[in-house]
Amino acid sequence: MTITEAVAVMEEAIETVVGHATEAQTERDRQIAEDNGAEMVTGTTAPAKSTPTQAQTEAEKKAERLRKLQAMKEKHAQKEAKEAAVTAGSTRMLLAEMDQKASGTPGPNSPVAGAMSPAPTSPAPPMPYAGKFDPKAIAKSSKAARPQSPTRLGDVKLAAPAPKPLGLKKEANLKGAGLLPANRAKSSTKRKIDMDDEEVIKRKLVKLPDFVPENADSTPDAEGEGEEEADDLDLLMAQNEEEMAEAHRVLQERRDERIQKEGMAMDVDTETPNGETKDEAENEANVESKDEAVLPAPSMDVDEDVDPLDAFMADLEQTGSAGGIGSVPARQKQKAGKGFEPEAYFSDDDYGYEEDKADPSSILAMASKKKKKDIPTIDYSKIELNQIRKNFWVEPQELSQMTEDDIADLRLELDGIKVSGKNVPKPVQKWSQCGLTRPILDVVEGLGYEKPTSIQMQALPVIMSGRDVIGVAKTGSGKTMAFVLPMLRHIKDQDPVTGDDGAIALIMTPTRELCTQIYSDLLPFAKALKLRAIAAYGGNAIKDQIAELKRGAEIIVATPGRMIDLLAANSGRVTNLKRATYLVLDEADRMFDMGFEPQVMKIFNNVRPDRQTILFSATMPRIIDALTKKVLREPVEIQVGGRSVVAPEITQIVEILDEGKKFVRLLELLGELYADDDDVRALIFVERQEKADDLLREVLRRGYGCMSIHGGKDQEDRNSTISDFKKGVCPIMIATSVAARGLDVKQLKLVVNYDAPNHLEDYVHRAGRTGRAGNTGTAVTFITEEQENCAPGIAKALEQSGQPVPEQLNEMRKAWKEKVKTGKAKDASGFGGKGLERLDKEREAARVRERKTHKAEGEEDDFKEEETAEDAAKKDKAKSAILAAASAIVSRESAKADASEAKPLPAAAEGAVKGGVTVNAGKGGALDKAASAISEINARLARAGQLRPGQPIDNKGPDAGAFHATLEINDFPQKARWAVTNRTNVAKILEATSTSITTKGNYYPPGKEPPSGSDPKLYILIEGDTELAVGKALSELTRLLREGTIAAADAESRAPASGRYTIA
């Protein structure tokens, strides 16, 4: 059959498909109608006309779709006929190419497989097919033609398809018309098969023509995609083998073109055996012909008589024999003797990561470093810092005209201001002279501040000039505004905070309450100047504060502990102090009194060196002068009213009472206070937290509304308590010294020191909660005769404030000084803070003890404690005591022998007594002394044959062991005695040694000897059949006794609990 005849047969088959489909549909409709009629006869409940009507409708739809398909095909055939004259040469070229492929001998000028070829076109309209369409007959004729194919197995070539189709419409038209299924245009991921042992070449599998069984039913389905697939299958079956391969070539070309247009990720860059990409091979194929290394695609030119798998395997063998080293792609190299080595994408090696070796020392060092919360150290010498402006002070003309005498008189009038330093600016007298901006002055006027206070008059010009300042002023004198107003001017002069920049101003306070109060005072100014401020203190979730810092802030008000947490969080990436140029310590002296010096110094060392530092407090003892020299540079010291002085507006009353009369006197004071005015507040200070809760219950029982606040309460409770106290919800508040700093309540008229403060600074701050901002108040202090240590501070405060000192209080002060002189008592200033390192050590020691207690049997310790001199002394003491208590192992035969014949303590027991180290007893030093002590004990026991004078050794019964030893435990601590008599420990020793352990004697208190004729002191008798068993048991008992003794000594040396709470 020639190519022209094949084209004619294909067109006739298309015409026949349409007619056959119409007849088949009509036959199905008739069958459905007959079935529905049978159902009506048998009495079914379905309507009689519904099904035939529906079948007719479906038949009409099917017929309409087939008519549209036929019209499209006719239009396409007419267009091809018009192009036949133009493409006649191309058609002849295509026919010649197909004839050459069928004969197996390529012509001299034939194009290489893979080059672009025009699509087949029919030169004339098809002739009608006179016969009946029979798919089975067509399949049989196709099968009969297969043996005549000249293509051999070895001649099958695989090559990439041609890139472009010519003269045909896009595949979307065929799919929309129902010729192609919707999912056929989608390409699945190509699987790559490795069946070669030496070389691997990446190949792409192409879908082969659909296999149609000979007895397949060609009746199209009536639903969805089944109809389209049936029509397409009928179309393919109506062709011969060569035309079928050509049709698949066209479909593959259209599919590739659509994929390229849609940008789908397909493997179109597959390498050829020569190392070139497919596109490069195709471009070269258009210029010159290639050798047979370039193989045609199996889905285009492979005859159906060759099995696809056989063709693929044969092609692999041919390529493997012809390929060289260069044919193996770089990403699919194969190791000798091994399978295919996959390539890792997005590997850690691509980024240069290197895994550190698991060094235990480095892991422990890293763990301890994370636990320590170290702040990243910043070396400012290697950082180029921007220059900042700190001096904003311009002296007004009014002040410049004042003489030195005028300035001295002015300072004397302003509560006796004292300044020290070089070139101290003159004090101002009104807000307009301070050099503040207009928005700041508007807020000041809105808050009702008419004129500056004494400390503000002198501190504002000094701070505005950029100098470091130490400010000491009485409580309630406006110290907060003295450092806040210059801070705002300092911040506005610098660039805005952006990105990861830290804050410009940092204010640190010792208590959370003072932190919140300063923050609330800042808010009106920050809002007016569009600045952001953050209050960072403990008790609240740190994640919220970190989130605020991430958004950026110019001002941070914080406590030292929480500030260190923020600086150390995430290895210092949360915030930093690189831009912090204004640093304030409010109530600075109390920070160091509370033990914050290490934390404060860490923060100071992390701030840039050209900062401006301001220290403010109501008390500034000389003891912290050394600190100020470390952190300040040429400071100006300002004192208003002297150091540690109670304001003159406060009336101070000191009463010496017994402990039982304090509460009655407190009720009298409260009754007198609220008899005159109901809208007043009273603040009661106590020493301990449990005392605050106990006093709260007693006051509530008397009908007074009150609340308590102390460090043991949650921060939210503390905040709400202070808020309610200020609003008057609860007019009485009971607190520890945690509320003695920064608490500012205008209606506070009475302060009661229920428990007297133990040093001057605490007393000044407690009394300073009242009489603030020019108001009057009363401070009453209860002191007992036993509290002589509190008398010196209270008496000094009365003297400095110009108030009389009670005679009895003066006598108590003298008595205390006499005790200090004679050495019976020790005076303490209150500044004994050493940071939190001591607490960390105590927690670590407790953790080690807990791990030892809960350690599983046989588990080895994974930590090593550092033995101090104190620990060594405890072990030596326990060792000597055990040496004196343990006896030698004596047999029944030698019980009455001479002391020189007694057997010494075996090496195992002696090693246990000496701390687990066994040595020869002949060496000098302390070991000789221990050996001589053991010999003396053995000699005494063996010579007399008695445990104690007058007491026989009681292992003479019929069941007594051949060897025995004793261990006296009467004079050891209770923990040690319990360790060697505990049933669990004894049972383990009995099981391990097969000995008998008996506790005998009576317990006598330390220092008491047993009377004559009574039982001896408490001891343990160890009996066994062999000397080795008795020695092993004695060794274990002495080890337990030594550990118990050391544990008891540790418990005694530890400081007792704070006593704030007790467990009932």
Swiss-Prot record:
User: What is the documented function of this protein?
Assistant: ATP-dependent RNA helicase involved spliceosome assembly and in nuclear splicing. Catalyzes an ATP-dependent conformational change of U2 snRNP. Bridges U1 and U2 snRNPs and enables stable U2 snRNP association with intron RNA.
The EC number(s) given in the record are 3.6.4.13
Q: Which reaction does it catalyse?
A: ATP + H2O = ADP + phosphate + H(+)
For this record, the Gene Ontology CC terms, alphabetical, are: nucleus
Cross-referenced SMART domains, in alphabetical order?
DEXDc, HELICc
What UniProt notes about the protein's domains is:
The Q motif is unique to and characteristic of the DEAD box family of RNA helicases and controls ATP binding and hydrolysis.
Family named by the database record: Belongs to the DEAD box helicase family. DDX46/PRP5 subfamily.
Residues bound to ATP: 473-480
Q: Note the superkingdom of the native organism.
A: Eukaryota
Tell me a GO biological process for this protein: mRNA processing
Q: Does Cytoplasm show up as a keyword for this record? A: no
State the Gene Ontology terms under molecular function. ATP binding; ATP hydrolysis activity; nucleic acid binding; RNA helicase activity
What's in the keyword line of the UniProt record? ATP-binding, Helicase, Hydrolase, mRNA processing, mRNA splicing, Nucleotide-binding, Nucleus
In this chain the Helicase C-terminal domain maps to 665-813
Q: Which PROSITE patterns match?
A: DEAD_ATP_HELICASE, HELICASE_ATP_BIND_1, HELICASE_CTER, Q_MOTIF
Please name the top-level EC class of this enzyme.
Answer: hydrolase
Residue ranges, compositional bias (Polar residues) = 42-57
Location of the Helicase ATP-binding domain = 460-638
Which chain positions lie within coiled-coil regions? none
Q: Which Pfam families match?
A: DEAD (PF00270), Helicase_C (PF00271), KH_12 (PF23469)
In Swiss-Prot or TrEMBL terms, this protein is called Pre-mRNA-processing ATP-dependent RNA helicase PRP5
Biased-composition ranges, Basic and acidic residues, are 835-848
**Residues spanned by motif Q motif:** 429-457
| Bias (Acidic residues) ranges | 220-231, 858-870
- What is the protein's species of origin? Chaetomium globosum (strain ATCC 6205 / CBS 148.51 / DSM 1962 / NBRC 6347 / NRRL 1970)
